[in-house]
Amino acid sequence: MTVDLDWENLGFNYRKLPFRYISYFKDGKWDEGQLTEDATLHISEASPALHYGQEAFEGLKAYRTKDGSIQLFRPDENAKRLQRTADRLLMPEVPVDKFVDACKQVVRANEEYVPPYGTGATLYLRPLLIGVGDIIGVHPADEYIFTIFAMPVGNYFKGGLVPTNFLIQDEYDRAAPHGTGAAKVGGNY
């Protein structure tokens, strides 16, 4: 049913799993997409994702329930947020049904890596949308890659979630006007 891992001590680290999903946008449309064992993205050195940050990502989890079934947590909401981010970055939207289906394919293909119920671990999915192609000027790409890879993870923080005191400053806003503060892009992290 599952692989032999120390499920309760995974941490939040990359682990290469057997399968991931990849789809290409070219000539104004997405291809069908497919599962692949190739964990390498082959892109042009002139890709806008590398020079101008034309990339977006999501993060969502699949978990095993008490009865052994596997659930994805709100993949449609992640798909909609990726669409909003894509729109903000002048990228083509990934249709919600394509996004959700791709997530399901990745989970099914890597099912043995979905941690057992009760361990506190989950299967983390990382959807990624990047602008590729030979574009060196400051304008949107004409080709894109949408990919999803997965890995079993534990808590993001080593000690788990621990309450902490903090101060919320509401007098200043460091976000640039009309910027990417509401988008899930690498430049915000």
Give the location of each predicted region.
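Intrinsically disordered, low-complexity linker/loop segments enriched in Gly/Pro
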Residues: A109, G131-V132
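Helix-start/capping segments and mature chain N-termini
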Residues: M1-V106, I135-Y189
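Basic, glycine/lysine-rich polyanion-binding surfaces/domains
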Residues: P115
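Extended, Lys/Arg-enriched charged tracts that mediate electrostatic binding to polyanionic substrates
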Residues: G118-I130
